[in-house]
């Protein structure tokens, strides 16, 4: 029962419209061969979890498999138990002590100090990365700057900026799935960037029977 609650599947029907911090969605869920009365009452078939597979219990090379599974590599390559991982990064604009507000944009390298050791090339004019763009390690996903002055007592001084961008670190192919901009209760804008990545079963993943 406990593992059934943790099973990967479709956790809500509107997951494509949500910006949850982290979400796991099974790409090809299937309904069980046998239904129960409770499953029909709570309409579990609308949010299925798990996949129907053919399981063989056998001795392998003369030794019994204990607490482990062997998968057909061809089935895994064709998408068996493949899942999509959604991860959301959130960034809120704030007002600094000097009264200046943060600006979400692509930094001007000639006027911005404190630039990160990262890739800014994928940032658009809004300070975000276009949807369905591949994100690699040390790419900037949310870019913004804070206006500063070299000398606060000199109003004629050229305004410069300090980088406040966010670097994304990953070791897998990740894409920008959706960008969302809005304002909070204080009137400041905030940005949410939902990222997605495809994953296949690897050593250490846990599986169980739902029957």
Language model regions located:
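Conduit-forming functional cores of very large proteins
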Residues: 1-211
């Amino acid at each position: 029962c406990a593992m059934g609650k943790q099973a990967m599947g479709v956790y809500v029907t509107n997951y494509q419209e949500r910006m949850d911090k982290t979400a796991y969605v099974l790409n090809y869920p299937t309904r069980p061969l046998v239904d129960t009365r409770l499953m029909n009452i709570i309409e579990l078939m609308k949010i299925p979890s798990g996949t129907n597979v053919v399981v063989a219990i056998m001795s392998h090379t003369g030794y019994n498999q204990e607490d482990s599974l062997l998968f057909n590599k061809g089935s895994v390559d064709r998408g068996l138990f493949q899942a999509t991982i959604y991860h959301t990064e959130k960034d809120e604009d704030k007002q600094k002590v000097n009264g200046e507000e943060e600006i979400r944009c692509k930094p001007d390298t000639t006027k911005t100090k404190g630039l990160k050791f990262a890739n800014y090339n994928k940032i658009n004019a809004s300070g975000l990365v276009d949807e369905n763009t591949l994100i690699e390690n040390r790419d900037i996903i949310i870019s913004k700057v804070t206006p500063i002055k070299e000398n606060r007592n000199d109003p004629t001084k050229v305004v410069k900026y300090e980088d406040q961008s966010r670097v994304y670190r990953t070791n897998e192919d990740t894409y920008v799935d959706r960008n969302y901009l809005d304002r909070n209760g204080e009137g400041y804008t905030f940005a949410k960037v939902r990222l997605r990545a495809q994953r296949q079963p690897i050593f250490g993943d846990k599986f169980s029977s739902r029957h």
